[in-house]
């Protein structure tokens, strides 16, 4: 808990300056000096510099969104609607920190492996928190589908910078893949009955 508080304090000091595309791994030490942030503190908390700041930002977005939506998710029966609630809240939180979100998303686009890791972690956390126990698609297939929906939604938001359009875009994707899962499950059940597999 103490480390999270320390991370948050350092991140808040840096956040205003992260909105500038001039900040990078090579000149971050100069920024730390000007903001009177001890290098030892920073490198203990964020040893991989902007990579770790980026991961922390997305993790924080998820935690904020999760707290806001968790009770509504638990009341909802439909997995597609649960997923949509989570994803919508993430996009709203992302949009509320527009400049910082643009900075880290742009940074992630230049570091695709890092962005993939972050988005996969988000999809895994969402899947765990919505409590899906259905068997229409495999464990990894569902995460991969959600990974693509989240990634596409982030790219769509980055292109349009329009929260409303992005929410509509992500909702259509979630509903489409929900229907694919139901269709696959129904087809499997039909084959089992017909051929007694």
Q: Where does each model-flagged region fall?
A:
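Short, amphipathic alpha-helix enriched in basic
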Residues: 2-37, 48-55, 59
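Key DNA-contact positions within bacterial/archaeal DNA-binding proteins
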Residues: 40
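Alpha-helical DNA-contacting segments of helix-turn-helix folds
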Residues: 45-69, 103-104
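Hydrophobic alpha-helical connector segments
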Residues: 68-101
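Amphipathic alpha-helical segments used for helix-helix packing
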Residues: 91-113, 117
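Amphipathic alpha-helical packing segments from all-alpha helical-bundle domains
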Residues: 110-132, 141-147
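Hydrophobic alpha-helical segments that form the core
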Residues: 139-158, 168-176
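C-terminal peripheral helix-coil segments that are non-catalytic and often amphipathic
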Residues: 159-197
């Amino acid at each position: 808990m103490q480390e999270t508080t320390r991370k948050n304090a350092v991140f808040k000091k840096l956040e205003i300056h992260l909105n500038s595309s001039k900040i990078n791994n090579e000149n971050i030490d100069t920024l730390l000096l000007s903001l009177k942030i001890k290098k030892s503190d920073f490198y203990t908390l964020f040893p991989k510099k902007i990579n770790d700041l980026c991961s922390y930002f997305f993790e924080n977005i998820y935690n904020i969104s999760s707290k806001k939506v968790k009770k509504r998710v638990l009341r909802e029966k439909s997995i597609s609607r649960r997923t949509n609630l989570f994803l919508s809240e993430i996009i709203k939180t992302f949009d509320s920190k527009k400049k910082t979100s643009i900075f880290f998303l742009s940074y992630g686009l230049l570091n695709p492996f890092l962005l993939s890791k972050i988005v996969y972690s988000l999809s895994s956390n969402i899947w765990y928190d919505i409590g899906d126990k259905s068997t229409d698609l495999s464990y990894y297939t569902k995460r991969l589908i959600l990974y693509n929906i989240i990634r596409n939604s982030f790219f769509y938001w980055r292109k349009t910078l329009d929260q409303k359009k992005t929410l509509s875009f992500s909702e259509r994707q979630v509903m489409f893949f929900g229907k694919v899962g139901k269709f696959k499950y129904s087809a499997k059940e039909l084959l089992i009955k017909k051929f007694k597999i």
